[in-house]
Swiss-Prot record:
Protein's UniProt name: Transcriptional regulator MraZ
PANTHER family registered for this protein in UniProt: TRANSCRIPTIONAL REGULATOR MRAZ (PTHR34701:SF1)
GO molecular function: DNA-binding transcription factor activity; transcription cis-regulatory region binding
Family to which the UniProt record says this protein belongs: Belongs to the MraZ family.
Disulfide bonds: none
Keywords: Cytoplasm, DNA-binding, Repeat, Transcription, Transcription regulation
Description of how the protein assembles with itself and partners: Forms oligomers.
Presence of the UniProt keyword Transcription regulation in the record: yes
Keyword DNA-binding applies: yes
Length: 150
């Protein structure tokens, strides 16, 4: 589905809103319909300090794994609790903006600007400073991983 590819930097307004890149909005439904209806996304706090934005169809596939976990197994129940604690739903307004909850902005250290990376079926949201730092610190690791998987 989706096919989000590319990277853009946008500003965050005083209400915690940012603009979904136009090229990504075009991939949502027929574009106009998604804006008129107010497209819903799921946003998750990632373990690396970024945020991940999923369309409902994509999140539903991921959620199947969570739903298969038992509430009677303490580890599985804890995992479900921790995953859902890191998740929220957000709606895109008619201007193509999404407002992120304050605790999500804090998690990702997003203040004035946001970097939106298209990662095929999801968008990864970073603070520009955190992204630059992560890339700088993992330069040789990237080479090793790319060599291993590509």
């Amino acid at each position: 589905m989706a096919g989000f590819i590319g990277k853009e930097q946008h500003s965050i307004d005083e209400k915690g809103r940012f603009m979904i890149p136009a090229r990504f909005r075009k991939l949502l439904g027929d574009g106009k319909e998604a804006r008129a209806k107010g497209a819903i996304f799921y946003v998750m706090k990632a373990f690396d300090g970024s945020l991940e934005l999923y369309e409902p169809e994509i999140w539903a596939e991921k959620e199947k794994g969570l739903m298969s976990l038992s509430d009677f197994n303490p580890d599985e129940r804890m995992l479900k609790t921790m995953m859902y604690e890191r998740l929220d739903s957000v709606e895109m307004d008619r201007q193509g903006r999404i407002a992120l909850p304050k605790d999500f902005l804090l998690h990702a250290a997003i203040v004035k600007d946001i970097v939106i990376i298209g990662a095929n079926v999801k968008m990864i949201l970073w603070s520009p400073e955190k992204l630059t730092s992560m890339i700088r610190e993992s330069g040789t690791r990237f080479q090793v991983l790319a060599g291993r998987y590509f």
